[in-house]
Each structure stands twice: as structure tokens, then as C-alpha cells.
Curated annotation (Swiss-Prot):
Liver and testis. It is found in: Endoplasmic reticulum membrane; Microsome membrane. This is Cytochrome P450 2A1. It catalyses: an organic molecule + reduced [NADPH--hemoprotein reductase] + O2 = an alcohol + oxidized [NADPH--hemoprotein reductase] + H2O + H(+). Induction: By 3-methylcholanthrene (3MC). PROSITE patterns: CYTOCHROME_P450 (PS00086). The keyword Metal-binding applies.
Length: 492
């Protein structure tokens, strides 16, 4: 039996050999992007401001350039900062950067299944089917427009019922936007007081809040250990199972009344495809159906409702902007009909305001992580297969080369000298490349129709002085959150 001293020598020698081999392989293949030196296991955790990771990454980009490496715990991440680096990776080398990176909170639920959190051939097949099915059910067409307007009508009635009293608009918007995606996925809407519906919203909100919390950030870095430890993460693990069980039951209900010749909703279309492809290698199976449906709910609920909620705050802070939107609504739509999506072509100022709300809010500045699917050379650096990549979309939204005063809320960022809408290459709120948000068409339609319908019926009122409005999103780890507030919807 080896004594302790000899055993220690053997271990140190083995580690030294492994390190030398790793360094030799790196030298042969090429060099990794530069970055701060990580500590064992905890990586660069102590060098990051965990309350505002985006600011820390901005500071690191000033030192290391637009492509650099950080370690979030034991996980190596390559960061892409600025328009040029992001475009070169996600567009010019789209295939190599098409994998889905690690997001521990959501991976606890999705585990690599479903359209949003899968990679490789699975992601390609599910994405093709999802885009085609959403298109079949009217996304970007009149069919979904009618569903949005129907839901907008219910929202207006709810807001009228507040009689101008100050309210937090969060739950009102969440119910409305979630019901739009529900009508597409399930083929029906929920009553706003339906306990099943409220439970679904509560569980999704719980996961989103945990992911943005300090504990959620630690879990993202050290989930391999924390999943075995007591703490809030254990409750989230239970929530993920409840969400999966909820969606399994919804699929079962659809399956029991399925007519293969007449699909009623997204679930029906997926079930029919499952029946058509029964070979063992098909990606069209129950697990992917359940997780794709959940993916659509997460993507289709939070983003639009949060953007609108932040938009209300910005319009109250800038009443001159709200007044111009009211004026354009009066000129183009009037008071005697509902808005239509085709109206946005005649309403450049309103569309510029919506774009500027998205840009200024910058609620997910780090974007959604990508993953390198094969050994890749990028800007002279070697990126091994399996490396996670953060395309920092927030760096595009605040680039003074594209937005002269990025810290100011200014719809003129999207208007030319004639007051017409202009494109801005750095405005990529739905990302770009092969993994851009497949619900971007739906989100754009919702933002325009819901905002114009609300402003056609109400003026916004803040219960305190305008100077008391805090319009700056609050940094929270990997994300930014909207300040809590109340407001009044004053009937016109």
C-alpha cells in the first residue's frame, strides 16, 4: 500500500502531465481567446460583479477586446462583444455557433429537449416543424391577428374595470400575452381567473425569478454541486416536474380527441407528425412535444409582457412621446375601429417608439448562450467543440456608433430626416443567425396591436411626480429587471 507522501507525488505528477498535454494540444490547435486568469473550480466568480454581470463584461471587453474568455465556475465561456464580433459569429459562421449553451435553471426542466434548448439535428428538425406549424396557424397572418385583437378586447375590459385606480399592470399583461400563445398551442384561451391558468403563470414566473436571482446565478455556475444541496433550487426542481406534468396532461387531452385530418392547434400538428414518423431515430416524440410546447409558452409570455410593462413606464416618463403616439393613432386608426397590423406601415413614429422601448430596456443584455458544435477557428482563436458562447446583444443596443446617445430614450434612433422608419443593423432584439427567436413575427405583432389598442382607449397617469419615475432597468446578475410601479389607465 502506497504511503501518503508517495500517493501525493503520484497525484501531482499525473496532474502535471494532464496540464502539459492540455497546453500542448492547445498550442498545436491554436490559442483560446484571452481573458482573466481563473481560479480552480470557482473560475472568475470573484472578479465579476454578480449584481451586474453585464457591466463586468463591458469592463473586461475594454481590456481584452471584443472576443475573450471567462470562466463561470468551472465552465469556460467565450464572450462576443460588439456588432462586428456578434455578426461574424452568428451570421457568417452560423453553423458552427448554432448549438444551445448551458442555462442550468432551464436545463433542469428541458434537459436538451424541445425546440429552444436542443442542439444539432434535433434542433433543426424541431425548428423546421415549429416555424411551419406556427405559420399554418396564422403567425404573421390575419388568423393570429384576430386572436391578439380578441385578447386585447378582454384586456381593455379589465383595465376599464379598474376605474382609473392605480394598479400594477404586471398580471394583466401576463394573462393577456399568455392567452395569445395558449390559443395557438392549445387552440383555446383560459378565463383570466382559471386556477389552472394562474398556476401555470405562477410556476413560470417562479422559474424566471429564480434564474435572475443571486441563488439562480450561483446555480448556473455550480449546478453540478448545488443540485444535491438544500436551498431554493430544490423548490425549482419540484416546479419543473409540475410544469412537465401540466403539459403532459394537456397533450393527453388533445390526443384523446385528435382528428388526423383536421389539426386544431400546435399540439395536434405535432401529434400527427409523430404518427407519420414512427422510426426510432425520429425527433418527433412525446418528450420533444412536451418540451417544445413549454418552450413556446416561456418564449411567448415573458418577453412581450415585460417589454410592454417597461414601455408604459417610459411613456409616462416622456409624456411628449406618448402624446405623439396618441396623435398618430388618431390620424391613422381613429376611434371607430380596432387597430390592424397593416397600420404599422403607416405609423412610423409608433413603430419607432416600440423599437426604442426594446432597445432602451435591453432586459437580456447577455443574450441566450450558444454552443460551438465543432472545433472552430474564429478571428484567429481556437474554439473547441462544446464551448459555450455569450453573444452580448446588449453591446449592440448601446453602441454609440449606431445609437448616438445610447443612454437616452429617443425614438429618433429609428427615424430618418423625413420622419420615416429606418433600419438599424445593430437592432437585434430577437438575435440573429440560425437560432434567432422563431416567435419574432408573433412578438412584433403583439407589441404593436396591444400597445395601440391600449393607447386608443387610455391615457397613462403616474400617481406621483414625473421626476420620481425611475426609468432605468435594475441590473440583476445576468439580466436587468423593470422597477416595480403602479399606474392609472385613464379612459379617453
Amino acid at each position: 500500500m502506497l504511503d501518503t507522501g508517495l500517493l501525493l507525488v503520484v497525484i501531482l505528477a499525473s496532474l502535471s502531465v494532464m496540464l502539459l498535454v492540455s497546453l500542448w494540444q492547445q498550442k498545436i490547435r491554436g490559442r483560446l481567446p484571452p481573458g482573466p486568469t481563473p481560479l480552480p473550480f470557482i473560475g472568475n466568480y470573484l472578479q465579476l460583479n454578480t449584481k451586474d454581470v453585464y457591466s463586468s463584461i463591458t469592463q473586461l471587453s475594454e481590456r481584452y477586446g471584443p472576443v475573450f474568455t471567462i470562466h463561470l465556475g468551472p465552465r469556460r465561456v467565450v464572450v462576443l462583444y460588439g456588432y462586428d464580433a456578434v455578426k461574424e459569429a452568428l451570421v457568417d459562421q452560423a453553423e458552427e455557433f448554432s448549438g444551445r449553451g448551458e442555462q442550468a435553471t432551464y436545463n433542469t426542466l428541458f434537459k436538451g429537449y424541445g425546440v429552444a434548448f436542443s442542439s444539432g439535428e434535433r434542433a433543426k428538425q424541431l425548428r423546421r416543424l415549429s416555424i411551419a406549424t406556427l405559420r399554418d396557424f396564422g403567425v404573421g397572418k390575419r388568423g393570429v391577428e384576430e386572436r391578439i385583437l380578441e385578447e386585447a378586447g378582454y384586456l381593455i375590459k379589465m383595465l376599464q374595470g379598474t376605474c382609473g385606480a392605480p394598479i400594477d399592470p404586471t398580471i394583466y399583461l401576463s394573462k393577456t400575452v399568455s392567452n395569445v400563445i395558449s390559443s395557438i398551442v392549445f387552440g383555446e384561451r383560459f378565463d383570466y381567473e382559471d386556477t389552472e391558468f394562474l398556476s401555470l403563470l405562477q410556476m413560470m414566473g417562479q422559474m424566471n425569478r429564480f434564474a435572475a436571482s443571486p441563488t439562480g446565478q450561483l446555480y448556473d455556475m455550480f449546478h453540478s454541486v448545488m443540485k444535491y444541496l438544500p436551498g431554493p433550487q430544490q423548490q425549482i426542481i419540484k416546479v419543473t416536474q409540475k410544469l412537465e406534468d401540466f403539459m403532459i396532461e394537456k397533450v393527453r387531452q388533445n390526443h384523446s380527441t385528435l382528428d388526423p385530418n383536421s389539426p386544431r392547434n400546435f399540439i395536434d400538428s405535432f401529434l400527427i407528425r409523430m404518427q407519420e414518423e414512427k422510426n426510432g431515430n425520429s425527433e418527433f416524440h412525446m418528450k420533444n412535444l412536451v418540451m417544445t410546447t413549454l418552450s413556446l409558452f416561456f418564449a411567448g409570455s415573458e418577453t412581450v409582457s415585460s417589454t410592454l410593462r417597461y414601455g408604459f413606464l417610459l411613456l409616462m416618463k416622456h409624456p411628449d412621446v406618448e402624446a405623439k403616439v396618441h396623435e398618430e393613432i388618431e390620424q391613422v386608426i381613429g376611434r371607430n375601429r380596432q387597430p390592424q397590423y397593416e397600420d404599422h406601415m403607416k405609423m412610423p413614429y409608433t413603430q419607432a417608439v416600440i423599437n426604442e422601448i426594446q432597445r432602451f430596456s435591453n432586459l437580456a443584455p447577455l443574450g441566450i448562450p450558444r454552443r460551438i458544435i465543432k472545433n472552430t477557428t474564429f478571428r484567429g482563436f481556437f474554439l473547441p467543440k462544446g464551448t459555450d458562447v455569450f453573444p452580448i446583444l446588449g453591446s449592440l443596443m448601446t453602441d454609440p456608433k449606431f445609437f448616438p446617445s445610447p443612454k437616452d430614450f429617443d425614438p429618433q434612433n429609428f427615424l430618418d430626416d423625413k420622419g420615416q422608419l429606418k433600419k438599424n443593423a445593430a437592432f437585434l432584439p430577437f438575435s440573429t443567425g440560425k437560432r434567432f427567436c422563431l416567435g419574432d413575427g408573433l412578438a412584433k405583432m403583439e407589441l404593436f396591436l396591444l400597445l395601440t389598442t391600449i393607447l386608443q382607449n387610455f391615457r397613462f397617469k403616474f400617481p406621483m411626480k414625473l421626476e420620481d419615475i425611475n426609468e432605468s432597468p435594475k441590473p440583476l446578475g445576468f439580466t436587468r429587471i423593470i422597477p416595480k410601479y403602479t399606474m392609472s389607465f385613464m379612459p379617453i
